[in-house]
Amino acid sequence: MSDVIMVNTEYIPGKRIVKVFGTIWGITVRSRGLGGNLVAGLRSLAGGEIKEYTKMLSDARNTAMERLQSAAEQIGANAVINVRFDSSDIGQVMTEIVAYGTAVLVEDVTDNIQRVGLS
């Protein structure tokens, strides 16, 4: 399991950004294949969720996130902020999933600042 922190916010509570590496991404392209497209096409006639595509896209999203974490580790980042996803179709049988964000190096905040919480 990776120690890279991944968040969709601009900061991480309790951490301070000490270095910004820049934008990084993890990409995967998936194809359902002829048999899967045929089954999904038949299911789409009846309406409702097409579970074959849902699983494929969920797996692709997880792969893109794993590749994003790996890209962060390779450049020495220990966190990725502003994580986002994008997808696009390539032709009629392939889908590209991209996970991207800003790779940063963070450290714990050790200031003697008293934090006031909301109650």
From Swiss-Prot:
Q: For this UniProt entry, which segments traverse the membrane? A: none
> InterPro entries per the record?
UPF0145_dom_sf (IPR035439), UPF0145_YbjQ-like (IPR002765)
Quote the Gene3D superfamilies the UniProt record gives.
Hypothetical protein apc22750. Chain B
Annotated coiled-coil segments of the chain: none
The family line of this record is: Belongs to the UPF0145 family.
- Protein name per its UniProtKB record: UPF0145 protein Ta0182
- What are the leading ranks of the lineage? Archaea, Methanobacteriati, Thermoplasmatota, Thermoplasmata, Thermoplasmatales
